C-alpha cells in the first residue's frame, strides 16, 4: 500500500448541494423510491422514468444519467438503450449498474448492448458482477455476489476493457482507472442486510458525477456511504432502523461535510 489519493470529498459534496443537479434514474422497481428519496436527501434532484418515449428528452435535460438493469423488461430495455445512445451523442455523464449480470442470458445481452454504445464513463457493481464483466468466472445468485476472484484485479480489468472507471463494491470497495486500483475498507456489515444499498451507491455516484470527474465521483460516493454506515449503525438497533438512519445521516453529512471525517482510500499495488 502507498499513500491515499488526493480527492476533495467535502468540496464535491458541497458542489452537489449548491448546484442541485438533476439525476435521471433508469432503475429497478425494488429500489426506485428509496433512490429518489436519497437523491433529495443529499441535495440533488431526481427524475425517475423507464419510458422509451421520453428517454432521449430526459437525457437532454439531466446533469447525469444512471442506468440500473435490476428489473429488466422489454420497455425498460429499449428505454435504457435509447438513453445510452443519447448520452453518448450529447456527452452526458452516465453510469451503468449491471445488477445481476451473469444471472440470465437476458441480462448478459442487455449489458453487452449497453456497453457497446460507449456511453459510460463509470461502471459499478458488486464483486461478482464486476468479475464476470472482467471475463472471470463467479457464481451469481439473484443480484448478490456469491463468490468471486479478487475484486481489485477485476475492477482494473473492467476499467481497461471498457475505457472507464470501474467500481467493485463489497466488504472492501475497489475503484480503478485501468492503471491504478484504490481500496476503501469502511462499510458496515448491515449494508448487506438491506436490499438496495448497492443501488444507493449508484445514486450517490451519479450525483457526484454531475459535478466532477468519474474517479473522484466514485470515490466520494463510496466514502460517503462508508462514513454514513458507521454513524448510522451506532444509532440503530438493527437493519430496519439502520436503513432509516442512513437517510438522516447522509443528509446531515452533505449539509455540513466539514463537520465529519471520512474513511480514507489507499492506493494498492495490483
Swiss-Prot record:
Residues binding substrate, per UniProt: 48, 196
GO BP, sorted A to Z: thiamine biosynthetic process; thiamine diphosphate biosynthetic process
Cofactor(s) demanded: Mg(2+)
Pathway: Cofactor biosynthesis; thiamine diphosphate biosynthesis; 4-methyl-5-(2-phosphoethyl)-thiazole from 5-(2-hydroxyethyl)-4-methylthiazole: step 1/1
Keyword annotations: ATP-binding, Kinase, Magnesium, Metal-binding, Nucleotide-binding, Thiamine biosynthesis, Transferase
GO molecular-function terms, A-Z: ATP binding; hydroxyethylthiazole kinase activity; magnesium ion binding
Any Pfam family: HK
Family, per entry: Belongs to the Thz kinase family.
Function as written in the Swiss-Prot or TrEMBL entry: Catalyzes the phosphorylation of the hydroxyl group of 4-methyl-5-beta-hydroxyethylthiazole (THZ).
Official protein name in the record: Hydroxyethylthiazole kinase
Source organism phylogeny: Bacteria, Pseudomonadati, Coprothermobacterota, Coprothermobacteria, Coprothermobacterales
